[in-house]
């Protein structure tokens, strides 16, 4: 069963600040690899070897948030599987008609009400839906119950902040920063160790839930080897948010002590770190691993786009630590700083998108 972990879902609801209206960056990443995923599944998914009498095909989206991207990703998978099923049924009469069961998983305080309220009506004729609350850093579904698992832009969220980075007596104390920007070697090492541990737990749980021959599709962001987080636009954004918090402490809105104890449970691995963490799990084979540019990485994103996206992503974790009254002022200050000092995207080093397909042995 799922083990306890820090719980910071995306901003819920359906207002202007919610994740549902501020996740187009993530959708662009999903769209960017859709054709490659389609091609792989068509060529490699073997329904007959899974079970010639298979009548219910099960899909799980881990870290689904509140939509709409989860519905988009799931529908892509279903469309591909239906096409593959049609092809196999024409070639072999043993192939049974298929129904689809989809499990939508996220943290218990994820806004599942908004998720299912905004589910496309057409999808209800395509598959049966189930919400599964629980951290994916542990099992959330029965053994051998899933044919395809999917997760998109989730595993950079750690199960917890490494304890050392909040310890004033540790060399890894991250006093002047709110995230792992790779400026302090000991901080980077603490985050890296936590990421490797979490990825191991994640893959172990998925290996138990997937049927033999089942696929785990993982999409997320990483850093090219040798690139530091502070050199990317995303790193600059988080450092700027940290600067805004310092300004608010000066004004008495929050305190230095609270800021010193605040770190984001987020780590973007370098490519070699990511591959090493995945290869540790012997119950999967790496069927495909590609590192590609995000479709929007070369675009000069507007200040409003950046502010809205990061508010939707970070407001829950910020509110939990500093209190809800801080959020509005923080992002007002953040928008002001971006206006005064726009990010020069051309000078920033690029984060990359990893697209990995694993097969359960």
UniProtKB/Swiss-Prot annotation:
Cofactor notes: Binds 1 Mg(2+) ion per subunit.
Q: What GO annotations for molecular function exist for this entry? A: metal ion binding; methyltransferase activity
Recorded hits in InterPro entries, A to Z, give: MeTrfase_7, MeTrfase_capping, SAM-dependent_MTases_sf
**GO BP, one annotated term:** methylation
- Lineage: superkingdom: Eukaryota
Residues the entry annotates as binding Mg(2+)? 174, 260, 262-263
Cofactor(s) essential for the protein = Mg(2+)
Q: What is the E.C. number?
A: 2.1.1.-
| Residues reported in the UniProt entry to bind S-adenosyl-L-homocysteine | 19, 64, 69, 106-107, 135-136
Alphabetically ordered keywords of this record = Magnesium, Metal-binding, Methyltransferase, S-adenosyl-L-methionine, Transferase
- Pfam families membership: Methyltransf_7
Q: What class of enzyme is it?
A: transferase
Family the entry assigns: Belongs to the methyltransferase superfamily. Type-7 methyltransferase family.
Record's subunit section: Homodimer.
Q: What is this protein called?
A: Probable S-adenosylmethionine-dependent methyltransferase At5g38780
Which species?
A: Arabidopsis thaliana
């Amino acid at each position: 069963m799922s083990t306890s972990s820090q719980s910071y879902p995306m901003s819920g609801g359906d207002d202007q600040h919610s994740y549902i209206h501020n996740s187009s960056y993530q959708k662009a990443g999903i769209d960017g690899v859709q054709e490659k995923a389609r091609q792989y599944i068509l060529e490699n998914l073997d329904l007959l070897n899974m079970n010639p009498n298979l009548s219910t095909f099960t899909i799980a989206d881990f870290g689904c948030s509140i939509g709409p991207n989860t519905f988009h990703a799931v529908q892509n998978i279903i469309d591909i599987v239906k096409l593959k099923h049609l092809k196999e049924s024409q070639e072999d009469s043993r192939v049974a008609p298929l129904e689809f069961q989809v499990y939508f998983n996220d943290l218990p305080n994820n806004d599942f009400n908004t998720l299912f309220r905004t589910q496309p009506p057409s999808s209800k004729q395509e598959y049966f839906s189930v919400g599964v609350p629980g951290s994916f850093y542990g099992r959330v579904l029965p053994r051998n119950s899933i044919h395809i698992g999917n997760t998109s832009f989730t595993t950079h969220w750690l199960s917890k902040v490494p304890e050392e980075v909040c310890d004033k007596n540790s060399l890894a104390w991250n006093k002047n920063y709110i995230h792992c920007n790779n400026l302090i070697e000991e901080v980077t090492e603490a985050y890296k160790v936590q990421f490797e541990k979490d990825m191991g737990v994640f893959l172990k749980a998925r290996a138990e839930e997937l049927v033999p021959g089942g696929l785990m599709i993982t999409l997320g962001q990483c850093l090219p080897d040798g690139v530091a987080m502070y050199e990317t636009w995303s790193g600059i954004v988080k450092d700027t948010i940290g600067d805004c918090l310092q300004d608010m402490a000066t004004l008495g809105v929050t305190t230095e002590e609270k800021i010193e104890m605040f770190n984001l449970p987020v780590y973007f691995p370098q490519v070699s770190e990511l591959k090493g963490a995945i290869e540790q799990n012997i119950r999967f084979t790496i069927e495909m691993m590609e590192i590609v540019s995000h479709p929007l990485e070369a675009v000069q994103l507007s200040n409003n786009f950046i502010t809205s996206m990061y508010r939707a992503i970070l407001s829950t974790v910020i509110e939990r630590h500093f209190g809800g009254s801080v959020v509005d002022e923080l992002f007002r200050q953040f928008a002001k700083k971006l206006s005064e000092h726009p990010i020069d995207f051309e000078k920033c080093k690029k984060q990359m998108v990893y697209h990995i397909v694993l097969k359960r042995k």
